[in-house]
């Protein structure tokens, strides 16, 4: 993600405070100059940058600050707070109501990725258990219905449109009525793309809006136009009641920071951001976690939400086995399935403190996914005895012929099968040691159930299993321990005050 360049530069500026022997006005000004330069390079409006600098300066009075206070943390906190303010419109975003029929109308410029974003939003809510559907009321662009139909079919989302009807108002009205009668909860209407000077298309947009009475009008914005987003968003807000904004193409443009801050300046809440072309390259936008991830400080709350989506608590049989230190090849297979359900690896890594959003490139991500699928293919060729044995690796070592059979069945080499078994053995050994830690699987606040010495042992085991580069990115053992503490607090629902500056 190109936005990661901005995150890297700001993080580098903040870290310069740690290298300074004395924190004085000169050090503060040098750091602020670096931060402001990075923001200007990301096309953030100069007035907003100037305001950020003034706000930090007024919040930090080095001469008046008590000697016992940690000046570095105070400055870092002030910068973090101002960065959050930069992308926060100060308006609560609209959210759909479960059990109700929520009609969402999409508007935006041509080429902003509106039709693709409609499908992404429908897929996002579908994965969360909502009954979603799509309506194509874009009769202006040739191929619009074909594109929506293709996206919807691929994601198995019901859709409505017409090749013969040319009146978007009729299509939208008929589609909404049809899906309301079928009790759909999220009804998404895609409209024709337009430019702000096209009065006829704006009139059409108003007619569609008046006909279907949407609960939420979403404006889709292309991040590549940077701070010009502000004028575009205002033009749309003047015509229709735009309640939310989705910013697309944040993965490929250096002006993303300018786009986000410009939208916030219009007092329109950003609800999602598009970070790639795939249907799951789509993330809910929350200001504080976004800035936290941008600066490599992670988003533990988001990570816990992802884990909770998998409903792992329902798997009582697995929890019971883990309590006794048992872990089979089938368990590993199921965990691989869960990892794939959580979405793109880069999104997950970005939520872990110490990792920037750029840690894993698209190429590496595809390679990792392919490797995971390959391991699952190998396990698909194993029989029940091999998958369900509490010591799966021993079953294969006693009868090496099994390795050859599995390799032939999955179309891989015997070495690939052996590598899988080695990986499984490491997992199984760790689970065995975790099973000896009383209170680890009780649920609730782990820090109350598990002693400090036991937690330290668990952290050491995790560190041994990790790739050294990964551990380094997390800030070594201290970073790993900090993440585990945050995860414990998050699991207990205590997310307040988690700023994560201790590893800066």
Curated annotation (Swiss-Prot):
Keywords: Cytoplasm, Endoplasmic reticulum, GTP-binding, Hydrolase, Nucleotide-binding, Nucleus, Ribonucleoprotein, RNA-binding, Signal recognition particle
Annotated GTP binding sites: 108-115, 190-194, 248-251
GO biological process, one term: neutrophil chemotaxis
Role of this protein: Component of the signal recognition particle (SRP) complex, a ribonucleoprotein complex that mediates the cotranslational targeting of secretory and membrane proteins to the endoplasmic reticulum (ER). As part of the SRP complex, associates with the SRP receptor (SR) component SRPRA to target secretory proteins to the endoplasmic reticulum membrane. Binds to the signal sequence of presecretory proteins when they emerge from the ribosomes. Displays basal GTPase activity, and stimulates reciprocal GTPase activation of the SR subunit SRPRA.
Entry text on domains: The NG domain, also named G domain, is a special guanosine triphosphatase (GTPase) domain, which binds GTP and forms a guanosine 5'-triphosphate (GTP)-dependent complex with a homologous NG domain in the SRP receptor subunit SRPRA. The two NG domains undergo cooperative rearrangements upon their assembly, which culminate in the reciprocal activation of the GTPase activity of one another. SRP receptor compaction upon binding with cargo-loaded SRP and GTPase rearrangement drive SRP-mediated cotranslational protein translocation into the ER.
Record-stated family: Belongs to the GTP-binding SRP family. SRP54 subfamily.
Protein name from the UniProt record: Signal recognition particle subunit SRP54
Organism of this sequence: Rattus norvegicus (Rat)
